[in-house]
Amino acid sequence: MKSLVLLLCFAQLWGCQSAPQGTGLGFRELACDDPEAEQVALLAVDYLNNHLLQGFKQVLNQIDKVKVWSRRPFGVVYEMEVDTLETTCHALDPTPLANCSVRQLTEHAVEGDCDFHILKQDGQFRVMHTQCHSTPDSAEDVRKLCPRCPLLTPFNDTNVVHTVNTALAAFNTQNNGTYFKLVEISRAQNVPLPVSTLVEFVIAATDCTAKEVTDPAKCNLLAEKQHGFCKANLMHNLGGEEVSVACKLFQTQPQPANANAVGPVPTANAALPADPPASVVVGPVVVPRGLSDHRTYHDLRHAFSPVASVESASGETLHSPKVGQPGAAGPVSPMCPGRIRHFKI
């Protein structure tokens, strides 16, 4: 009898520790494809994207689990597990998420797994807790789907570093205004055929002009950060190398006082020989935030900076999606996990 009492006590203690802080012990399970669950999940992903510091924006792929806890004295707390997928839009890109393409499996996709606790009280949502991590698709799965598709390559790979330096030098060469520095290597792949290296990276405007830079270390980033996102390809030909780079500037870049009156255009392309002119100074590749750059992707575990809370009026940040009503006949769908919106990794 004493053993049974002790067992019940331990069960109650475990339940108290598992429940989100401030809730009662009672909860209800909500179907993962319920419009209510989808609305809260979209809000959670929106919160995630608003606080990403590096890497790429995320899109909701699947809701794995939902519990709705009663909160004393008022409100409810949604405890959710969701899967996300990386998009092609960088975290700093102001492009609306709806206009961002999902990174496809053939591009070596990366999946995010997130746990959220979201309070709903008086029609207001507040994110109380967030914990995420990322996992790329396995090389084996990519090879099965597309044997010749390039895989993710470490940021500190020799070809990657060389391509980023060369591409940034090419961009600064054809730019008559602000000198840009590297902020982050976002993605890299070595392509076997034709032999080339693909890179995506973030740049930022400095207080120097591109034509007058002699020591990049003396160029400081502007107080109000002005970022751009670049994609580059370095072809390894028999007769040498050729780089092509295209950069999208997220805002109109202010020019230093002694700069040319004509500033850089929002999108710039360059196709130049790999070796920059002697007058062009290439700064070293930056290793951001002290993380080892044998990484091949930006893990949400490090890229996401959680904030204590973010309040959002229910209907201001997102709208409930149109969810089809179930037919009169047919098998009953399981409550969870929910539907896969794109593809499963």
UniProtKB/Swiss-Prot annotation:
Residues with the Phosphoserine modification: S134, S138, S305, S309, S312, S314
Entry keyword DNA-binding: no
Disulfide bonds: C32-C336, C89-C100, C114-C132, C146-C149, C208-C219, C230-C247
Record's subcellular location: Secreted
Residue span, Cystatin fetuin-A-type domain: 19-133, 144-250
GO MF term set: cysteine-type endopeptidase inhibitor activity
Protein name, as recorded: Alpha-2-HS-glycoprotein
Record-stated family: Belongs to the fetuin family.
Tissue expression as described in the entry: Liver is the major site of synthesis, but fetuin is also expressed in limb buds and other extrahepatic tissues during development.
Top-rank lineage group of the source organism: Eukaryota
SMART domains cross-referenced by the UniProt entry: CY (SM00043)
The keyword Acyltransferase appears for this protein: no
Function: Probably involved in differentiation.
Note: Human AHSG interacts with Plasmodium berghei TRAP (via integrin-like A-domain); the interaction promotes sporozoite invasion of hepatocytes and formation of exoerythrocytic forms of parasites in human hepatoma HepG2 cells.
Broad class of where this protein is predominantly found: secreted
Signal peptide: 1-18
One GO term (biological process): regulation of inflammatory response
Disruption phenotype: (Microbial infection) Increased prepatent period of Plasmodium berghei infection. Fewer Plasmodium berghei exoerythrocytic forms.
Region (Disordered): 312-334
Keywords per UniProt: Disulfide bond, Glycoprotein, Phosphoprotein, Repeat, Secreted, Signal
Gene Ontology cellular-component terms listed: extracellular space; Golgi apparatus
PROSITE patterns named among the record's database cross-references: CYSTATIN_FETUIN_A, FETUIN_1, FETUIN_2
Phosphothreonine sites (modified residues): T135
PTM text: Phosphorylated by FAM20C in the extracellular medium.
Annotated glycosylation sites: N99, N156, N176
